[in-house]
Amino acid sequence: MLSPLKNISLGSELKSLWTVFLHLFQPKATIQYPEERPYIPPRWRGRIILSRDPDGEERCVACNLCAVACPVDCIALQKTEDEQGRWYPEFFRINFSRCIFCGFCEEACPTYAIQLTPDFEMGEYERPNLVYEKEDLLINGTGKYPDYNFYRVAGMAIGGKTKGEAENEESPVDVRSLMP
């Protein structure tokens, strides 16, 4: 006579075999990766790039908000200034061996310079190759925001003119005049 423990074991083995038999005739879910590309959702967060303004200048103003927002501290940059007073990063470095692709840097960027692309093929054999410099990250195009130019929106100081005297600029509002 079989003990109750062996009956339970035999029943679970038969159930497992039945499940395997049912799945035997279903289509395979394997995708042959290099030949067949997988479906990537539209908001996939992949490789990070630095974009340019419509006039070809770097969008990044080295405000350091991306580095502060990064939870794993994988972004490093140093600010410098050109002759016109425009800020730009002297160096911009992302360590992709630490990056978790959370997208906080893209959300923190006021100039839309940092953008995450759907590219996910970043495999490397050596860890130092995962540290990308500004030259590796900078693209020739404007990315997701083709018409946005930070300095047209925010403005730069114009020599000889005070606030509100430049083209397309309104004079500042006196806040005290708005009070009841």
From Swiss-Prot:
Reactions accelerated catalytically: a quinone + NADH + 5 H(+)(in) = a quinol + NAD(+) + 4 H(+)(out)
EC number(s) per entry: 7.1.1.-
InterPro entries reported in the protein's UniProt record: 4Fe4S_Fe-S-bd, 4Fe4S_Fe_S_CS, NADH_quinone_OxRdtase_chainI
Gene Ontology CC: plasma membrane
Keyword Iron tagged: yes
Entry superkingdom: Bacteria
Domain 4Fe-4S ferredoxin-type residues, every copy: 50-80, 90-119
Entry keywords, A to Z: 4Fe-4S, Cell inner membrane, Cell membrane, Iron, Iron-sulfur, Membrane, Metal-binding, NAD, Quinone, Repeat, Translocase, Ubiquinone
Cofactor binding annotation: Binds 2 [4Fe-4S] clusters per subunit.
PROSITE patterns named in the record: 4FE4S_FER_1, 4FE4S_FER_2
GO biological process, one term: aerobic respiration
Nucleotidyltransferase in keyword set: no
Residues bound to [4Fe-4S] cluster 1: C60, C63, C66, C109
Pfam families recorded: Fer4_7 (PF12838)
GO MF entries: 4 iron, 4 sulfur cluster binding; iron ion binding; NADH:ubiquinone reductase (non-electrogenic) activity; quinone binding
Protein localization: Cell inner membrane
Cofactors (names): [4Fe-4S] cluster
NCBIfam families: NuoI, PRK05888.1-1
Family stated for the protein in its record: Belongs to the complex I 23 kDa subunit family.
Name of the protein this chain belongs to: NADH-quinone oxidoreductase subunit I 1
Classification of source organism: Bacteria, Pseudomonadati, Pseudomonadota, Gammaproteobacteria, Chromatiales
